[in-house]
Curated annotation (Swiss-Prot):
Source organism per UniProt: Bordetella avium (strain 197N)
Pathway membership, UniProt: Amine and polyamine biosynthesis; ectoine biosynthesis; L-ectoine from L-aspartate 4-semialdehyde: step 3/3
Function comment: Catalyzes the circularization of gamma-N-acetyl-alpha,gamma-diaminobutyric acid (ADABA) to ectoine (1,4,5,6-tetrahydro-2-methyl-4-pyrimidine carboxylic acid), which is an excellent osmoprotectant.
UniProt-listed SUPFAM superfamilies: RmlC-like cupins
One Pfam family in the UniProt entry: Ectoine_synth
One term of GO molecular function: ectoine synthase activity
InterPro entries according to UniProt: Ectoine_synth, RmlC-like_jellyroll, RmlC_Cupin_sf
Biological process per Gene Ontology, one example term: ectoine biosynthetic process
PANTHER family given in the database record: L-ECTOINE SYNTHASE, PTHR39289
Enzyme class: lyase
Name under which the protein is recorded: L-ectoine synthase
Protein backbone atom coordinates (compact mmCIF):
# COMPACT_ATOMS: atom_id res chain seq x y z
CA UNK A 1 0.00 0.00 0.00
CA UNK A 2 1.13 3.51 -0.78
CA UNK A 3 0.09 6.31 1.58
CA UNK A 4 1.30 9.85 0.96
CA UNK A 5 0.36 13.39 1.92
CA UNK A 6 0.53 15.96 -0.87
CA UNK A 7 2.17 18.34 1.63
CA UNK A 8 5.19 16.02 1.69
CA UNK A 9 5.78 16.69 -2.04
CA UNK A 10 6.16 20.46 -1.57
CA UNK A 11 9.75 21.56 -2.12
CA UNK A 12 10.85 18.20 -3.55
CA UNK A 13 11.70 17.33 -7.17
CA UNK A 14 8.13 15.96 -7.47
CA UNK A 15 6.79 19.53 -7.20
CA UNK A 16 7.18 21.03 -10.67
CA UNK A 17 6.60 24.76 -11.23
CA UNK A 18 6.27 26.83 -14.40
CA UNK A 19 5.15 30.42 -15.02
CA UNK A 20 1.50 29.31 -15.33
CA UNK A 21 1.08 26.37 -12.94
CA UNK A 22 2.55 24.29 -10.14
CA UNK A 23 2.04 20.52 -10.04
CA UNK A 24 2.56 18.25 -7.06
CA UNK A 25 3.02 14.78 -8.50
CA UNK A 26 1.91 12.37 -5.77
CA UNK A 27 1.91 9.05 -7.67
CA UNK A 28 4.32 8.51 -10.55
CA UNK A 29 5.48 5.85 -12.98
CA UNK A 30 7.91 4.50 -10.37
CA UNK A 31 4.91 3.58 -8.18
CA UNK A 32 3.78 1.05 -10.84
CA UNK A 33 0.08 1.92 -10.66
CA UNK A 34 -0.36 2.32 -14.44
CA UNK A 35 -1.24 6.03 -14.04
CA UNK A 36 0.09 9.12 -12.31
CA UNK A 37 -1.88 11.28 -9.89
CA UNK A 38 -1.23 15.00 -9.37
CA UNK A 39 -2.57 18.05 -7.57
CA UNK A 40 -2.06 21.05 -9.86
CA UNK A 41 -2.80 24.73 -9.36
CA UNK A 42 -3.32 26.95 -12.41
CA UNK A 43 -2.32 30.53 -11.66
CA UNK A 44 -4.90 33.33 -12.11
CA UNK A 45 -4.89 35.20 -15.41
CA UNK A 46 -2.62 32.70 -17.20
CA UNK A 47 -3.03 30.87 -20.50
CA UNK A 48 -1.22 27.59 -21.24
CA UNK A 49 -1.12 25.80 -24.60
CA UNK A 50 -1.40 22.02 -24.05
CA UNK A 51 -1.49 19.11 -26.48
CA UNK A 52 -0.93 15.72 -24.87
CA UNK A 53 -0.05 13.69 -27.96
CA UNK A 54 1.42 10.88 -25.82
CA UNK A 55 -0.94 10.88 -22.83
CA UNK A 56 -4.58 10.77 -21.85
CA UNK A 57 -5.61 13.00 -18.95
CA UNK A 58 -8.65 13.26 -16.70
CA UNK A 59 -9.04 16.38 -14.55
CA UNK A 60 -11.33 17.05 -11.57
CA UNK A 61 -11.64 20.73 -10.61
CA UNK A 62 -11.64 21.16 -6.82
CA UNK A 63 -11.60 24.93 -6.24
CA UNK A 64 -11.14 28.24 -8.00
CA UNK A 65 -12.10 29.16 -11.54
CA UNK A 66 -10.82 29.09 -15.08
CA UNK A 67 -11.68 27.79 -18.53
CA UNK A 68 -10.55 25.36 -21.19
CA UNK A 69 -10.81 26.05 -24.92
CA UNK A 70 -10.41 23.37 -27.59
CA UNK A 71 -8.27 24.58 -30.46
CA UNK A 72 -9.89 22.42 -33.17
CA UNK A 73 -13.36 23.93 -32.79
CA UNK A 74 -12.91 26.92 -30.45
CA UNK A 75 -15.37 25.58 -27.86
CA UNK A 76 -14.88 27.10 -24.42
CA UNK A 77 -15.88 25.47 -21.14
CA UNK A 78 -15.97 27.16 -17.75
CA UNK A 79 -14.10 25.32 -15.00
CA UNK A 80 -14.86 25.36 -11.30
CA UNK A 81 -15.52 23.07 -8.34
CA UNK A 82 -17.10 19.77 -9.35
CA UNK A 83 -16.31 20.01 -13.08
CA UNK A 84 -14.51 17.02 -14.61
CA UNK A 85 -13.01 16.99 -18.10
CA UNK A 86 -11.20 14.21 -19.94
CA UNK A 87 -8.81 14.69 -22.83
CA UNK A 88 -9.80 11.36 -24.34
CA UNK A 89 -8.83 12.31 -27.90
CA UNK A 90 -5.49 14.01 -27.16
CA UNK A 91 -7.39 17.29 -27.51
CA UNK A 92 -5.16 20.30 -28.19
CA UNK A 93 -6.37 23.13 -25.96
CA UNK A 94 -5.75 26.32 -24.04
CA UNK A 95 -6.03 26.06 -20.25
CA UNK A 96 -6.79 29.45 -18.74
CA UNK A 97 -6.61 30.59 -15.15
CA UNK A 98 -9.49 32.77 -13.98
CA UNK A 99 -9.66 35.30 -11.16
CA UNK A 100 -8.82 32.77 -8.43
CA UNK A 101 -6.22 29.98 -8.45
CA UNK A 102 -7.73 26.87 -10.06
CA UNK A 103 -6.86 23.72 -8.09
CA UNK A 104 -7.34 20.45 -9.96
CA UNK A 105 -6.64 16.75 -9.48
CA UNK A 106 -5.13 15.12 -12.60
CA UNK A 107 -4.68 11.52 -13.66
CA UNK A 108 -2.34 10.68 -16.56
CA UNK A 109 -2.01 7.52 -18.62
CA UNK A 110 0.69 6.54 -19.32
CA UNK A 111 2.01 7.77 -15.98
CA UNK A 112 4.44 10.66 -15.78
CA UNK A 113 7.93 10.13 -14.37
CA UNK A 114 7.74 13.39 -12.43
CA UNK A 115 9.77 16.11 -14.12
CA UNK A 116 7.80 16.64 -17.34
CA UNK A 117 6.94 20.15 -18.50
CA UNK A 118 5.22 21.14 -21.76
CA UNK A 119 7.50 21.57 -24.75
CA UNK A 120 7.01 24.31 -27.37
CA UNK A 121 4.10 22.33 -28.86
CA UNK A 122 2.37 21.83 -25.49
CA UNK A 123 3.45 18.17 -25.32
CA UNK A 124 4.86 16.03 -22.50
CA UNK A 125 7.49 13.84 -24.16
CA UNK A 126 7.62 10.14 -23.40
CA UNK A 127 10.72 8.89 -21.56
CA UNK A 128 13.46 7.72 -23.95
CA UNK A 129 12.88 4.03 -23.12
CA UNK A 130 9.25 4.32 -24.28
CA UNK A 131 10.05 6.13 -27.54
CA UNK A 132 12.76 3.71 -28.70
Amino acid sequence: MIVRNVKDVIGTPDEVRTDTWVSRRVLLKKDKMGFSFHETTIFPGTRTHIHYKNHLEAVWCIEGDGSIETIADGKRYDLGPGVVYALNEHDEHWLCGGKEPLRVICVFNPPLTGQEVHDADGVYALPQAETA
